[in-house]
From Swiss-Prot:
It catalyses: N-terminal N-formyl-L-methionyl-[peptide] + H2O = N-terminal L-methionyl-[peptide] + formate. The keyword Cytoplasm does not apply. Keywords: Hydrolase, Iron, Metal-binding, Protein biosynthesis. One of its GO terms (biological process) is translation. Fe cation binds at residues 121, 163, 167. GO terms for molecular function: metal ion binding; peptide deformylase activity. This is Peptide deformylase. Residues 1-34 are annotated as: Disordered. Its cofactor is Fe(2+). PANTHER family: PEPTIDE DEFORMYLASE.
């Protein structure tokens, strides 16, 4: 997910994680983020059977890519790794605020009103369009140490979790955009192919 939510991000709750990489610095070589049109983005992700140092290093590499691209969320399929792993940091400019790592996340329930907000994505840079999503989500997952966790989130955190979890199923936020005119116009403006969008119900 891309940084078009700065005001909302400042109101976000603190996140807990021990996987840290430097923020606000030039990032070392990091995995390439695939963009709309890449088949890598459409492949479903597989569950991670064992949480180990290799998984933690992947999370660090994803964070480096995310920070370098000025994003607030990234899913493993976006860097061509088809495993169920997400990293989120709603306050990427605050060094003391650790990122959130979600391994094998599962939605327990969604609730609250259906809200419409503008979203962006590091895999579709420059495109920002309105998407309707539930305002609250209850998600269970394992953290970077393999411990089971459960989290209830609302606002930007809920939206970011839902956005990134879509990537694990090969779904992009543009697949959920209902304003066809705006969608086609934005994609054309930035050189993306409208035919690469796969609408979901």
């Amino acid at each position: 997910m891309s940084l078009n939510f700065a005001a909302m991000a400042r109101q976000s709750e603190r996140q807990a994680s021990t996987v840290m990489v430097p923020k606000g610095e030039e990032q070392p070589e990091s995995p390439k983020i695939h963009t709309l049109g890449s088949n890598e983005l459409r492949k479903p992700a597989k569950r991670i059977s064992k949480v180990n140092e290799q998984v933690r290093e992947l999370a660090r590499e994803m964070l480096r890519s995310m920070y370098a691209a000025h994003g607030i969320g990234l899913a493993a399929p976006q860097v061509g790794v088809h495993q169920q792993l997400l990293v989120i940091d709603l306050d990427p400019e605050e060094a003391a605020n650790p990122p959130l790592v979600l391994i094998n996340p599962e939605i327990v329930a969604t609730s609250g009103a259906l809200d419409t907000y503008e979203e962006g994505c590091l895999s579709i840079p420059g495109v920002y369009l309105n998407v309707v999503r539930p305002s609250q989500v209850d998600v269970k997952y394992r953290d970077e140490l393999g411990r089971p966790q459960r989290r209830k989130a609302d606002g930007l955190m809920a939206r970011c979790i839902l956005h990134e979890m879509d990537h694990l199923n090969g779904v992009l936020f543009v697949d959920r955009v209902s304003d066809e005119l705006s969608l086609s116009g934005e994609l054309q403006r930035l050189g993306f192919d409208r035919n690469d969008v796969k609408p979901v119900a």
